[in-house]
Amino acid sequence: MRVMVMVKATKDSEEGIHPEKEEFQKLLADMGKFNEELVKAGVLLAADGLKPSSKGKRVRFSSTERTVIDGPFSETKELVAGFWLWQVKSMEEAIEWVKRCPCPFPGVESEIEIRPLAEPEDFGEALAPEFKEYEERLRVQAAAGN
């Protein structure tokens, strides 16, 4: 199963504030080692950190209208500061990996959320076979860089 693992933003991460230099370098080294473990285990599919929401945009959909909303966005607890995309055998395996993760924001309470990705089989018979084949072709093309 594939899961998205999201590091929730904090007030400091939203303000672009990093820990002191020494502590930040240790965090980066620890995260690097953790990511290496994920790669060696065949779990890591993708990972990245995100800039604060002040650098982002949202597009609100209302019928046929699209409205662009400039960041920053006020609800810090709903914002994501970074993510991993993992291939794991179960939610329990994902939880065990997250428990091994270095604290993403040393010195403050932080949270990591794990969400399974919706896979074609989750839609059952509602997903036409030709759409499933189409999805698979797109995934292969994307992986090949086309």
Positions of the model-derived regions?
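Conserved, structured core segments of small domains
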Residues: 1-146
